[in-house]
């Protein structure tokens, strides 16, 4: 009643294993590949592991340092700096129940932070220190005060203007 498969239940699905002396390979720290087809003959041999310990890491002074930027990186940085050196047009749009400005369109340096836009708007609206002003770009999101005006204008401009909607109470979730 005892068959070879009943002694080892997993042997029914696996190929028969040959003893190491019959396979022609010696045991090593890596298991032998079980796939022996034409693909394995065309593949290159694996890179052997080094037998010595790990090398000491290089210090920062010994690492490679570029003496100058590549041309394309230098050109990209120059283009990015050129955008933030000009002026940007900002259009203020009041949301419901917000006071309306007489002049809604202003120019500001692209290198300024959005904080400058909010301070300028508070000054134009004659806000007290305790009054709140909520600003939204394109009536969609409230940018952080440390966001660059040039970057906001580049990404979210409409007709070459940065549309800033404002309200005295929170307008959006």
Swiss-Prot record:
Single GO biological process annotation from the record: autophagy of mitochondrion
Topological relation to the membrane, as annotated: Peripheral membrane protein
GO cellular component terms listed in the entry, alphabetical order: Atg12-Atg5-Atg16 complex; autophagosome membrane; phagophore assembly site membrane
InterPro entries named in the record: Atg12 (IPR007242), Ubiquitin-like_domsf (IPR029071)
Cross-link Glycyl lysine isopeptide (Gly-Lys) (interchain with K-157 in atg5) placement: 173
Region (Disordered): 1-55
Keywords on record: Autophagy, Isopeptide bond, Membrane, Protein transport, Transport, Ubl conjugation pathway
Molecular function via GO: Atg8-family ligase activity
Bias-annotated ranges (Low complexity): 1-15
Chief place where the protein resides: membrane
Compartmental location: Preautophagosomal structure membrane
Family: Belongs to the ATG12 family.
Quaternary assembly: Forms a conjugate with atg5.
Record function comment: Ubiquitin-like protein involved in cytoplasm to vacuole transport (Cvt), autophagy vesicles formation, mitophagy, and nucleophagy. Conjugation with atg5 through a ubiquitin-like conjugating system involving also atg7 as an E1-like activating enzyme and atg10 as an E2-like conjugating enzyme, is essential for its function. The atg12-atg5 conjugate functions as an E3-like enzyme which is required for lipidation of atg8 and atg8 association to the vesicle membranes.
Protein's name according to its UniProt entry: Ubiquitin-like protein ATG12
Gene: atg12
């Amino acid at each position: 009643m005892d068959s070879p498969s009943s002694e080892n239940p997993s042997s029914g699905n696996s190929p028969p294993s040959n003893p190491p002396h019959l396979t022609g390979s010696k045991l090593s720290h890596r298991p032998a590949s079980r796939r022996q087809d034409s693909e394995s003959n065309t593949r290159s041999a694996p890179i052997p592991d080094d037998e010595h310990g790990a090398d000491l890491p290089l210090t920062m002074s010994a690492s490679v340092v570029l003496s100058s930027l590549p041309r394309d990186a230098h050109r990209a940085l120059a283009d990015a700096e050129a955008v933030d050196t000009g002026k940007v047009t900002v259009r203020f749009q009041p949301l419901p129940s917000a006071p309306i400005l007489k002049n809604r369109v202003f120019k500001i340096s692209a290198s300024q932070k959005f904080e400058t836009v909010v301070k300028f708007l508070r000054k134009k609206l004659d806000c007290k220190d305790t009054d709140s002003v909520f600003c939204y770009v394109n009536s969609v999101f409230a940018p952080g005060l440390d966001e660059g005006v040039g970057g906001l204008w580049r990404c979210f401009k409409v007709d070459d203007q940065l549309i800033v909607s404002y309200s005295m109470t929170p307008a959006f979730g």
